[in-house]
Amino acid sequence: MSEFVTVARPYAKAAFDFAVENQALDRWQNMLAFSAEVARNEQIAELLSGAVAPIELAKTFIAVCGDQLDEAGQNLIKVMAENGRLPVLPEVLEQFIQLRAALESTVDVDVISANTLSEQQLSKIAAAMEKRLSRKVKLNCKIDKSVMAGVVIRAGDMVIDGSIRGRLERLADVLQS
């Protein structure tokens, strides 16, 4: 998987730079998202792993995408097909999203709780995370009954576990040692 990250990075960077230059970040993110979904399709994945000529592969892929790709998007697909890189399209999308978030100084923050949080609670969490990370945050709320109570907050590789489940697990670790 880390090899996919390495392979995808230059394609994501090129697409991102082109999108910024042409003020088309939303359009490019949508094109990449659609292309990534197509690449994840089982039948397309089989086609990508088969012995199909790159030109035919690009034509088929572009035909499946239809009018979801503009000319520049089609060119990206052609280049990736020529280099046998279409299977990494989902990772290209992820890298593109990360580059965009860095440009916009935003970070995705996952907030996992046992119950739905109020707007006031969410705004307090957002304010605290913005202060801690020195960036704007976008909260992604998820409900997981296994946390019992409290919240688990994830931002990149940082995890703040304020859940009852987390406390019980830490207590069990202390008692076992």
From Swiss-Prot:
The UniProt record lists the keyword Cell membrane: yes
Similarity comment: Belongs to the ATPase delta chain family.
UniProt function note: F(1)F(0) ATP synthase produces ATP from ADP in the presence of a proton or sodium gradient. F-type ATPases consist of two structural domains, F(1) containing the extramembraneous catalytic core and F(0) containing the membrane proton channel, linked together by a central stalk and a peripheral stalk. During catalysis, ATP synthesis in the catalytic domain of F(1) is coupled via a rotary mechanism of the central stalk subunits to proton translocation. This protein is part of the stalk that links CF(0) to CF(1). It either transmits conformational changes from CF(0) to CF(1) or is implicated in proton conduction.
Cellular component per GO, a single term: proton-transporting ATP synthase complex
Cellular compartments annotated: Cell inner membrane
Protein name (Swiss-Prot/TrEMBL): ATP synthase subunit delta
Subunit-structure text: F-type ATPases have 2 components, F(1) - the catalytic core - and F(0) - the membrane proton channel. F(1) has five subunits: alpha(3), beta(3), gamma(1), delta(1), epsilon(1). F(0) has three main subunits: a(1), b(2) and c(10-14). The alpha and beta chains form an alternating ring which encloses part of the gamma chain. F(1) is attached to F(0) by a central stalk formed by the gamma and epsilon chains, while a peripheral stalk is formed by the delta and b chains.
Membrane topology: Peripheral membrane protein
InterPro entries in alphabetical order: ATP_synth_OSCP/delta_N_sf, ATPase_OSCP/d_CS, ATPase_OSCP/dsu
A Pfam family per the record: OSCP
GO terms for MF: proton-transporting ATP synthase activity, rotational mechanism
PANTHER family: ATP SYNTHASE DELTA CHAIN
Keywords: ATP synthesis, Cell inner membrane, Cell membrane, CF(1), Hydrogen ion transport, Ion transport, Membrane, Transport
Cysteines engaged in disulfide bonds, as pairs: none
Gene3D superfamilies: N-terminal domain of the delta subunit of the F1F0-ATP synthase
